[in-house]
Amino acid sequence: KSSANNILIKLFGNFSRVFFNLPKAAFSAILFGLVGGYPTGALLSEELFEAGEIDSNQAKRLMCFNFCGGCGFIITAVGTVTFNSTRLGVMLFLSNALSSILIGFILSFKEKRLEKSEYSLFSFTSLGDALTLATPKAAQSVIVITAYIVLFSALSSTVKIPEPLLPIIEITNGVCNGDFSLPLTAAFLSFGGICIHLQILGVLRKFKMSYFEFLLFRLISSVLSYFIMKLLLYFFPVDLSVFANASTPVRLSSVNVTLSVLLVAGCFVSVLDLNSRRKVV
């Protein structure tokens, strides 16, 4: 009970139960799904499902909204590097995160509400063992992500793809090297790109969730992000001439360091949660 994660669950676990109608154990998956970037949310949702912390219906519901570009990519790579503005990156991240949270909240009414007394406390494995287990998982995820990005980058260099379609196919190069309005950029970031979608097809199959259902909610999230970004720009206007795209392309390596750290952190917390002895209070 004195462990850091138990404190985290006791302090914030009710957020996932009240706001998303999901078990308290889902809080870390949702949190790292938002800040860690795609496909972190899908990978951590898969961990929860395999450990029996959530059922297939809850897993499907998680996959409808637990999908976000994260702080490292949206704020740093898109905002700071591409638009020369961390502030603008924060606004883009907020438009995506709020879109995901809104969808998750609406879907919480789809199933019977969880009982208030249903929550978990854990007795953990050692930090050393958890780190040993988490690092290979994170490394494998980074390798898969990088492989898909390189593959789609090679395809886009070989095949002439119209610029408006590039972010739909491969989000990193499509958004960072494209020239789109800020609301449209937010929409593309929320969609995530086919390259990212392919990385989580195996997870969707485990949940018995069709890709078309996942795609539908990506489109809904994109529309919401578009209008949320327009709303943010209305209340916090920016001078577009100041935030013009950088003249040099964004290197993939400028994105992956932060993503790698967040993936390690996400897997580390997941191991602490899911390889422990569960007690229902």
Predicted regions and their residues:
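N-terminal signal-anchor module of multipass membrane proteins
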Residues: 1-10, 18
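Juxtamembrane interface elements at the cytosolic ends of transmembrane helices
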Residues: 4-8, 102-122
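Cytosolic juxtamembrane amphipathic/interface segments immediately preceding
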Residues: 16, 47-53, 123-139
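Alpha-helical membrane segments and immediately flanking helix-loop junctions
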Residues: 20-83, 167-177, 183-207, 216-219
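C-terminal transmembrane helix pair
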Residues: 72, 100, 182-275
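Alpha-helical transmembrane segments
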Residues: 88-105, 260-264
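Intrinsically disordered, low-complexity non-transmembrane regions of multi-pass membrane transporters
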Residues: 111-136, 240-255, 274-281
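Transmembrane helical segments that form the transport core of multi-pass membrane transport proteins
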Residues: 131, 135-193
